[in-house]
């Protein structure tokens, strides 16, 4: 009787393990549309009237968050904000968020987290857009890597060789 009970427990355990394997084998978390590059430079200060844009080809099926790294030179006496947007190739807004500039930490990741997961954009061109609505300066700079000479982004009307330090998190 004891052998029969042990055998049933072993068979049930194996069944449960295989069930979980087959249920979750297709679900993987992909951390990064590309690896976040090591910062080698920073843009000029983000000021009113300047829009920073980085286009990229998305490879993540379900986008759940995007991280961007900022640098800062000073904290403000007046309140200022930063807006981060994610747009599709037709300039349709997929998600956006406004941040108080003083809440953004030096060389830490700032996360753009859509309310709902963004799906259906694998292989599509997406654009990150960063700007301020404040009339004063922000004390913030976007970090980027200038090691990739094939890539570029816009700082206002100026094309800068390199890639903004960002990553995309989601399910593949």
Regions found by a protein language model. Give the residues of each.
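Surface-exposed loop/edge segments in extracytoplasmic proteins
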Residues: 90-99
């Amino acid at each position: 009787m004891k052998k029969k009970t042990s055998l049933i427990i072993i068979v049930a355990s194996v069944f449960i393990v295989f069930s979980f394997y087959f249920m979750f084998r297709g679900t993987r978390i992909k951390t990064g549309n590309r690896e976040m590059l090591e910062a080698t430079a920073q843009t000029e200060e983000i000021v009113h009237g300047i829009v920073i844009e980085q286009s990229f080809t998305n490879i993540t099926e379900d986008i759940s968050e995007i991280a961007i790294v900022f640098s800062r030179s000073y904290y403000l006496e007046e309140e200022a904000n930063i807006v981060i947007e994610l747009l599709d190739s037709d300039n349709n807004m997929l998600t956006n968020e406004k941040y108080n500039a003083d809440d953004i930490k030096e060389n830490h990741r700032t996360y753009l987290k859509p309310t709902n997961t963004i799906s259906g954009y694998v292989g599509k061109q997406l654009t990150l857009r960063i700007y301020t609505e404040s009339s004063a300066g922000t004390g913030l700079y976007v970090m980027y890597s200038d090691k990739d000479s094939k890539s570029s982004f816009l700082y206002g009307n100026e094309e800068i060789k390199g890639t903004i330090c960002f990553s995309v998190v989601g399910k593949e």
